């Protein structure tokens, strides 16, 4: 009798172990578009995020256009805005092009001809096309033919830096960011314009940036 009870209990345990667990296979949360200029209520950390990129570039655009030495010239100056001399020396992981691309594109739109933008980051593309025209591989196009490519008057330089503090007791991480922007006179090596954007964030559970 005892053996039969033991065998029955063992069989029940085996069947229970082989049974399919109660998994929640319901659909997850639907994708929702967020305003890029606001902080997410679900995913947010102490790094540089979309709302920071929007805020800093909007501020720099207003400041540049309000600077007579840059945007108030009789002959629109030529400027280069890319990430070549824009360094990330911070502990935050970010694609620098997110900042410089938005700054260049939105400034170009807002300047309305007061600034001329030199696409040095597309220099290889232009060189190949110019070579094809001059070798007779293609015709000269319909716009113009010049001996040299456009030289620039100013170029963007700057850096992202940060200062971190971590509380072992509470697990809170604090990060202060300082982002500098400068337009350099490419003939005299002087700084024609400077802008600074800074912010500080605290969080207990940081997020992973990719």
Where are the predicted features?
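Acidic/histidine-rich, surface-exposed loop or edge segments in extracytoplasmic proteins
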Residues: 33-48, 77-88
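Bacterial Sec signal peptide processing site at the extreme N-terminus
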Residues: 12-42, 209-210
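Bacterial N-terminal signal peptides that target proteins for export
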Residues: 1-7
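Outer membrane pore-forming secretion/assembly proteins and partners of Gram-negative envelopes
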Residues: 133, 138-156, 161-164, 172-174, ...
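A short acidic/small-residue loop/turn micro-motif
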Residues: 199-201
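Solvent-exposed, acidic/flexible segments
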Residues: 46-57, 92-100, 136, 170-177
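Short hydrophobic alpha-helix segments
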Residues: 195-197
